[in-house]
């Protein structure tokens, strides 16, 4: 047999038919073969911890281009100048399930964008639904655990999730989205992304606005029913990733129109809901009909152009955080956002190590000499009125986590608007999906679910009850 040569991680060559150094017969191979130890130790350590949430994902490279002048509302270099282009990388993901789970499962989807700006990296951490389940960050671990497999059997247990929902009514708005066909939008190219949180855009004179940005897919929505999604998951667990990469290979580059909603801090207390409550959406004109419309203003377009060459190095090692902001952007007082400012970097230190920002995927693309572009000195932030200060204090009060009427109003209006917005079949699909889930829980829990749904609408509770009990029987 001809001798072969292999190279260890140190770069040294080893020869021999079995790619091992020549042995002293009196010693074991492990005693002498440092290369074998090297190979095995590298294999044992080659995987890193998966993300606590958003573990399953896919990513691609693209660019953001400014298409509209927004210099009157922001002082963000990346957004100043029509035609300006900024390179970016985007990672799509499922949320609660593990890295090997099917992408078509009923789940909230993530869309995180890292912009490599001249001011440093600016991360947009978005979901495909414009709100979240909870507004009290202390509930987050329990909320995630409730959607994970039962710790006793490691099998999905819907009772855990419905128990959480029935005890935390602020979840109802997003639960309605989750169990509609919005929850089985498995095609990454066709899903939109919403920041969900309010941020602040600050001008050089210290004035500022609350803003919420979102990305509307130019491919249009692509919904599947629960039955179709289940079949897709059985046939191809990586369906969304495959679709994304194959479209890029064909030269079909997906794009998103980026828009921003703007609220003056003096107007925020006058709105009939709190824009710092992430369980509510900023009304674009769909619902509720009696709540102020906050129109979207077009900023630009994001287009994906190519996939990664090394998924682990370029996508898996990406570290996103809502705390990664640039000049002219600040976080709002939203408690969930404030918690995420800590939680994301902390999770990345555990997953990728304390120097995760030095990894190639996360390095800034600033000037080569390390200098920052000159920026005008920003004036101190202008202090809004006492009315605004009193309004902000609501998020720090003990009543912030308690249910209020808007927790039922928003899901109620969503339910009523579905036939108009998406059709009767879309509304009926929500009932079917809920019934299939609720039918798997004990009788006492089912009654609790029906009572909770009745707080939204009697006809919703009645329809879910009827179909659920038919399935059970």
UniProtKB/Swiss-Prot annotation:
Ranges of Low complexity composition bias in the record: 1-15
EC number: 1.11.-.-
Keyword Nucleus: no
Catalytic machinery residues: 54
Record SMART domains: Catalase
Biased composition (Basic and acidic residues): 366-377
Annotated heme binding sites: 344
Positions of region (Disordered): 1-31, 352-389
Pathway(s): Alkaloid biosynthesis; ergot alkaloid biosynthesis
CDD domains: catalase_fungal
Gene Ontology molecular function: catalase activity; heme binding; metal ion binding
Single GO biological process annotation from the record: hydrogen peroxide catabolic process
Keywords, alphabetical: Alkaloid metabolism, Heme, Hydrogen peroxide, Iron, Metal-binding, Oxidoreductase, Peroxidase
UniProt superkingdom: Eukaryota
Cofactor(s), by name: heme
GO CC field: mitochondrion; peroxisome
InterPro entries for the chain: Catalase, Catalase_AS, Catalase_clade1/3, Catalase_core, Catalase_haem_BS, Catalase_sf
EC top class named in words: oxidoreductase
Keyword Heme appears in the UniProt entry: yes
Family as reported in the entry's similarity comment: Belongs to the catalase family.
Role description: Catalase; part of the gene cluster that mediates the biosynthesis of fungal ergot alkaloid. DmaW catalyzes the first step of ergot alkaloid biosynthesis by condensing dimethylallyl diphosphate (DMAP) and tryptophan to form 4-dimethylallyl-L-tryptophan. The second step is catalyzed by the methyltransferase easF that methylates 4-dimethylallyl-L-tryptophan in the presence of S-adenosyl-L-methionine, resulting in the formation of 4-dimethylallyl-L-abrine.
Protein name (record): Catalase easC
Species, as recorded: Claviceps purpurea (strain 20.1)
């Amino acid at each position: 047999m001809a001798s072969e040569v292999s190279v260890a991680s140190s770069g040294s060559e080893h020869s021999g038919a079995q790619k091992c150094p020549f042995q002293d017969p009196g010693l074991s191979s492990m005693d002498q073969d440092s290369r074998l130890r090297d190979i095995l130790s590298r294999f044992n350590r080659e995987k890193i911890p998966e993300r606590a949430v958003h573990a399953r994902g896919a990513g691609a490279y693209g660019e953001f281009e400014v298409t509209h002048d927004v210099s009157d509302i922001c002082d963000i270099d990346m957004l100043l100048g029509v035609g300006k282009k900024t390179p970016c990388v985007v990672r799509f993901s499922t949320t609660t399930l593990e890295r090997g789970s099917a992408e078509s499962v009923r789940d909230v989807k993530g869309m995180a964008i890292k912009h490599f700006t001249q001011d440093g990296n600016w991360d947009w951490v978005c979901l495909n639904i414009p709100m979240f389940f909870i507004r009290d960050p202390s509930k987050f671990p329990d909320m995630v655990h409730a959607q994970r497999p039962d710790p006793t059997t490691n099998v999905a247990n819907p009772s855990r999730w419905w128990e959480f929902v029935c005890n935390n009514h602020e979840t109802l708005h997003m639960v309605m989205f989750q169990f509609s066909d919005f929850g089985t939008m498995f095609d990454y190219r066709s899903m939109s992304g919403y920041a969900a949180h309010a941020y602040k855009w600050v001008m050089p004179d210290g004035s500022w606005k609350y803003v919420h940005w979102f990305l509307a897919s130019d491919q249009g929505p692509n919904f599947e029913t629960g039955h179709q999604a289940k079949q897709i998951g059985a046939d191809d667990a990586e369906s969304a990733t495959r679709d994304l990469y194959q479209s890029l290979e064909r030269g079909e580059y997906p794009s998103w129109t980026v828009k921003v909603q703007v609220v003056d801090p003096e107007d925020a207390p006058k709105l009939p809901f709190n824009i710092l409550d992430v369980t509510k959406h900023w009304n674009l004109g769909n619902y509720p009909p009696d709540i102020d419309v906050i129109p979207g203003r077009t900023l630009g377009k994001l287009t994906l152009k190519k996939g990664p060459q090394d998924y682990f190095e370029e996508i898996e090692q990406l570290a996103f955080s809502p705390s990664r902001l640039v000049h002219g952007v600040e976080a709002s007082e939203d408690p969930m956002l404030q918690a995420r400012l800590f939680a994301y970097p902390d999770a990345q230190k555990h997953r990728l190590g304390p120097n995760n920002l030095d990894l190639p995927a996360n390095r800034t693309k600033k000037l080569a000499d390390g200098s920052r572009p000159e920026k005008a000195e920003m004036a101190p932030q202008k202090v809004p009125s006492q009315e605004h200060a009193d309004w902000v204090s609501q998020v720090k009060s003990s009543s912030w986590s308690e249910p209020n009427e808007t927790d039922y109003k928003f899901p109620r209006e969503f339910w009523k608007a579905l036939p108009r917005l998406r059709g009767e079949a879309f509304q009926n699909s929500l009932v079917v999906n809920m019934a299939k889930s609720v039918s798997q829980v004990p009788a006492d829990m089912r009654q609790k679910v029906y009572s909770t749904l009745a707080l939204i609408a009697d006809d919703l509770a009645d329809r879910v009850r009827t179909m659920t009990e038919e399935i059970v029987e």
